[in-house]
């Protein structure tokens, strides 16, 4: 149905990908590397690929890695600290999958601060709200350490295209292309993307479009 609608609309595509990822932070990078072994991926980023907020994350990543810790303890600490604002299902999912995510980062080549006196082999710290030492880190620049490794992986992967200084200005959706498209079949085909250096708009089509542009910082007028 998706490509049938595209053909009906006479949409001219400059580039076509299996997955279009808008945003070049750790979320977008991680998804790209997981998909790229079988898919053609494009990452669009409005500045240079290393200019996002991910590199500014300092403290570390929480994961229940020690034998005396567990995802259930991690969940309990998070729900208490969240004071009723946490989505319990999402909290459970993140806590259960955090150790696996850490091991994946290590496999990619991320060097976390070591501590041979710890059973895990890594230095774990304890931050506010946590009842256990479960913060794994890379010095005091964890985000930067992770980002640098993933950027190297991204740039060297033959199935990943990175377009810097490109900004998505609108999503291409079925309701915009075909006025009589059934609402139940509403889909996204890609995005119109502005090349900021050439001042030219291109049409990028994709079977899947992912928004990985960071937090919703404009939900409130002022944020800290």
Map each language-model feature to its residues.
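Extreme N-terminal leader/targeting segments of oxidoreductases
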Residues: 2-19, 37-38
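Core beta-strand elements of the Rossmann-like FAD/NAD(P) dinucleotide-binding domain
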Residues: 15-17, 199-208
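N-terminal Rossmann-like FAD-binding beta1-loop-alpha1 element of flavoenzymes
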Residues: 19-43
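Alpha-helix N-cap/helix-initiation motif
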Residues: 24, 139, 199, 219-224
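Conserved N-terminal/central alpha/beta ligand/cofactor-binding core
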Residues: 45-197, 212, 218
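Glycine-rich loop(s) and the adjacent beta-strand/alpha-helix scaffold that form part
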Residues: 208-224
């Amino acid at each position: 149905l998706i490509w049938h609608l595209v053909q009906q609309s006479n949409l001219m595509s400059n580039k076509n990908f299996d997955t279009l990822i808008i945003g070049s932070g750790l979320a977008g990078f991680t998804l790209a590397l997981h998909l790229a072994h079988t898919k053609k991926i494009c990452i669009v980023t409005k500045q240079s690929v290393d200019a996002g907020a991910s590199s500014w994350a300092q403290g570390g990543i929480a994961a229940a890695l020690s034998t005396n810790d567990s995802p259930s303890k991690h969940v309990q600490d998070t729900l208490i600290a969240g004071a009723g604002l946490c989505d319990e299902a999402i909290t459970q999912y993140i806590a259960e999958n955090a150790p696996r995510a850490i091991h994946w980062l290590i496999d990619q080549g991320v060097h976390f601060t070591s501590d041979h006196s710890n059973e895990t082999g890594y230095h774990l710290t304890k931050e506010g709200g946590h009842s256990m030492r479960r913060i794994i880190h890379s010095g005091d620049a964890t985000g930067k350490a992770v980002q640098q490794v993933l950027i190297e992986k991204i740039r060297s992967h033959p199935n990943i295209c990175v377009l810097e200084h490109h900004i998505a200005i609108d999503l291409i959706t079925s309701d915009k292309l075909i006025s009589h498209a059934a609402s139940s079949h509403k889909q996204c085909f890609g995005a119109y993307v502005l090349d900021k250096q050439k001042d030219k708009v291109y049409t990028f089509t994709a079977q899947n479009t992912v928004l990985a542009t960071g937090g919703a910082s404009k939900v409130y007028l002022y944020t800290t």
